[in-house]
A protein has these predicted regions:
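Sec-dependent bacterial lipoprotein signal peptides
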Residues: 1-15
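Generic, low-specificity signal for short hydrophobic/alpha-helical stretches with a mild N-terminal bias
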Residues: 11-15, 53, 66, 133
């Protein structure tokens, strides 16, 4: 009896697909931040698209509010570049290009999940029109849904009103 129960238990566990993570692609998640304050920001006047990517590579269209974006990499290449085009009066032609150099690493997750590619970012370069800097917080890109890249933008700041001392009479 006990052997039959154990065999049935193992068989049921082997057929279970709940162990597979929902996200089976390694996509680097990037967040947008203000270089002045360090706080997360939301932009709606930006288009983000792939440079030299086949077909329609627009990830974010102008008018779409975005504070985080997944920037897919290509397993057959060692570099991927993204264009940040600003759709705002006075900023025409001030596109920024962010380029990631990386190594593709095949990874076998499990029988249920199968295989995927992980990526190790080896270098990141950018132009500096409205992007102030790019920080790669974790160079290993896996299928874990975590913010790994922080893109800091130059943002306009409203001047703070200086405190005025109370007048004493």
């Amino acid at each position: 009896k006990y052997i039959l129960a154990a065999v049935l238990g193992f068989a049921a566990a082997a057929c279970n697909t709940d162990g597979c993570l929902d996200n089976q692609s390694s996509l680097p998640k990037a967040g947008l931040f203000s270089s002045a304050t360090g706080n997360a920001i939301t932009l709606s006047n930006i288009e983000i698209s792939g440079v030299g990517a086949p077909g329609d590579s627009v990830l974010v269209a102008p008018g779409t509010a975005v504070s985080e974006v997944y920037l897919p990499m290509r397993s057959t290449k060692q570099s991927t570049a993204w264009r940040f085009r600003y759709d705002q009066e006075g900023l025409e032609g001030l596109d920024d290009i962010v380029t990631f150099d990386y190594e593709s690493q095949p990874f076998f997750a499990s029988e249920e999940c199968g295989a995927m590619y992980n990526y190790r970012i080896t270098r990141c370069t950018t132009t500096y029109n409205l992007i102030d800097s790019v920080v790669v917080a974790d160079s290993l890109i896996t299928n874990t849904d975590r913010l790994r890249i922080k893109i800091y933008f130059r943002t306009a700041q409203t001047p703070e009103t200086p405190d005025t001392p109370d007048e004493q009479g």
